[in-house]
């Protein structure tokens, strides 16, 4: 149950009954401090100002008609007109019992929408690097959360599989095959192969002419060029899938919807934009001038949708892409996990999409932008030599460092168990370090911080789960086979349950805002509440059996909540570390 939403509805009804205009926001929030209750309604003051009345007097009118029977034990007016709400112990205990009995931990399914999530999007014939990490793991965490809530999510891996560079790549692939027969390439070779192709293109005019010819042939559907192009795509995606599998990312080859998918739509889009009077010829190119965006002279900004030579641009592809996602996929929401530097480009494409009537306003187009990964020097994260860090190399180093950490913490474990634990911790550490940060900010990549067992880190959260789960091994019982009822006998128990009951709020916030750090913060706070409870409230040596069973139930609900929350982030838990 989303208790915040429940109370918000109750306060909204009371506001209206007290004379507030229909639809006035109740603005119910989790209280920042225990002395202000569990929730606080902050909407009274805005309404009082609107009505020209005293906020505290109006707050009292709201309280007089506020029905929180069976939910709150106390309500009070604080400060200039806040309403503090204290949940009753009986209500909390009842909700905790219901959550523990529910495989979904009390999280309700939402009315299903069709949601397209555009994330990861590496380029063909290049290896994934650290710059692809944020889109890949942030997008995947949000996708998992949306699916948990019951939505139909279509993963769209919008790979860069088209463009003039394929002419030189195909020409070079043909050269290599003629010299040495059939070529079997790993992507590590393709990185060098790409550089070699570019060098030949820049320095060998005969090669460059052939490459440009192959661009035209590829675009016109030539069979040989199409075969070579497919080989480049296949080799790339096989290697990318290894990274996805290592990171426990839910993308597969079936989710690839590359730029090339929209090629046939592009001429029709430009023709339609011209017919609608949106695109006009300017210096031989087809341009859409947008009043919503100004150039440096304060004039409407021109967005090119077709070049003078007839070629199309990324903007044209993105217009077609949005149109396809609405018309063919039936999207209610489209989420783009693309870095913040692309914001203006997306806004321009979407403005054209709306003006042309390709996607109605009822469909939400959302740019879930993210910042950069920085090194300790505050500059973009690079190798020591100043090069781009390959994602596979980063994951390899994470596993080595995690193995050293596990060896120092638990050297007596069997080697295969140490390796399995290290791999799980390594991938979790890399992902959680990113997911725990607000996605719009840049963040500093720091091995020591991300592998620490203190603070808001993956090792800390994984250990928190292991610690809670170990209670049941010591008690000799299963967390799925507990007796008795949950009864609150201590303030720390109440505080723990109150935090546990905020799980649905965290899940819904991640889904609504595309911000996985909300879940990380929630889980970290939950682990802290459990530590306080564990220190103050003995479980295995509780004063009587009923209290022991009640506290075991709270431990079980905590373990299940941490496990489910981490799972939504694409992070595995461990039974021991």
Curated annotation (Swiss-Prot):
Keywords: Aminoacyl-tRNA synthetase, ATP-binding, Cytoplasm, Ligase, Nucleotide-binding, Protein biosynthesis. This is Arginine--tRNA ligase. GO terms for molecular function: arginine-tRNA ligase activity; ATP binding. Monomer. Its EC number is 6.1.1.19. It catalyses: tRNA(Arg) + L-arginine + ATP = L-arginyl-tRNA(Arg) + AMP + diphosphate. It is found in: Cytoplasm. The keyword ATP-binding applies. The keyword Nucleotide-binding applies. The gene is argS.
């Amino acid at each position: 149950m989303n208790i915040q939403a429940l109370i918000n509805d109750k306060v909204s009804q009371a506001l209206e009954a007290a004379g507030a205009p229909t639809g006035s926001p109740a603005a119910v929030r989790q209280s920042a401090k225990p002395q202000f209750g569990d929730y606080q309604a902050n909407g009274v003051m805005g309404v009082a100002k609107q009505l020209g009345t005293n906020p505290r007097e109006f707050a009292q009118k709201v309280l007089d008609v506020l029905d929180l029977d069976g939910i709150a034990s106390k309500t009070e007016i604080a400060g200039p007109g806040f309403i503090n709400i204290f949940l009753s112990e009986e209500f909390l205990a009842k909700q905790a019992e219901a959550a523990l009995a529910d495989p979904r931990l009390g999280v309700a399914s939402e009315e299903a929408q069709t949601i397209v999530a555009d994330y990861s999007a590496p380029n063909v014939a290049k290896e994934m690097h650290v710059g692809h990490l944020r889109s890949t793991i942030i997008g995947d965490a949000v996708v998992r959360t949306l699916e948990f809530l019951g939505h139909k999510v279509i993963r769209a891996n919008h790979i860069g599989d088209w463009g003039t560079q394929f002419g030189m790549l195909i020409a070079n692939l043909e050269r290599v095959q003629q010299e040495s027969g059939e070529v079997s390439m790993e992507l590590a070779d393709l990185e060098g192969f790409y550089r070699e192709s570019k060098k030949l293109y820049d320095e060998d005019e005969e090669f460059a002419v052939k490459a440009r010819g192959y661009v035209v042939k590829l675009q016109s559907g030539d069979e040989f060029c199409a075969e070579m192009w497919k080989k480049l795509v296949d080799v790339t995606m096989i290697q990318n899938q290894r990274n996805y599998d290592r990171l426990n990312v839910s993308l597969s080859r079936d989710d690839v919807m590359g730029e090339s998918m929209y090629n046939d739509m592009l001429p029709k889009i430009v023709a339609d934009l011209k017919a609608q009077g949106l695109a006009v010829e300017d210096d031989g190119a087809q341009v859409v001038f947008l009043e919503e965006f100004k150039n440096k002279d304060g004039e409407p900004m021109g967005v090119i949708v077709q070049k003078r030579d007839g070629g199309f641009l990324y903007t044209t592809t993105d217009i077609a892409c949005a149109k396809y996602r609405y018309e063919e996929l039936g999207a209610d929401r489209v989420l783009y996990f693309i870095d913040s530097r692309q914001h203006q480009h997306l806004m321009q494409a979407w403005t054209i999409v709306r003006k042309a009537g390709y996607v109605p306003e009822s469909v939400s187009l959302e740019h879930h932008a993210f910042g950069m990964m920085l090194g300790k020097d505050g500059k973009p994260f690079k190798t020591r030599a100043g090069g781009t860090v390959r994602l596979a190399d980063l994951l390899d180093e994470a596993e080595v460092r995690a193995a050293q950490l596990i060896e120092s913490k638990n050297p007596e474990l069997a080697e295969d168990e140490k390796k399995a634990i290290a791999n799980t911790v390594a991938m979790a550490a890399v992902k959680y370090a990113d997911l725990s940060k607000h996605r719009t900010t840049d963040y500093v990549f720091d091995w020591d911080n991300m592998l620490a067992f203190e603070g808001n880190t993956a090792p800390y959260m994984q250990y928190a789960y292991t610690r809670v789960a170990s209670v049941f091994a010591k008690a000799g019982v299963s967390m799925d086979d507990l007796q008795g009822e949950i009864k609150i006998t201590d303030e720390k128990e109440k505080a723990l349950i109150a935090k546990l009951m905020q799980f649905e709020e965290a899940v819904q916030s991640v889904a609504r805002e595309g911000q996985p750090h909300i879940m990380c913060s929630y889980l970290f706070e939950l682990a802290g509440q459990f530590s306080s409870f564990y220190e103050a409230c003995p479980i295995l040596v509780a004063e009587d059996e009923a209290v022991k069973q009640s506290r075991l139930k709270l431990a079980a609900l905590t373990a299940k909540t941490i496990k489910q929350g981490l799972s939504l982030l694409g992070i595995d838990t461990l039974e021991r570390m």
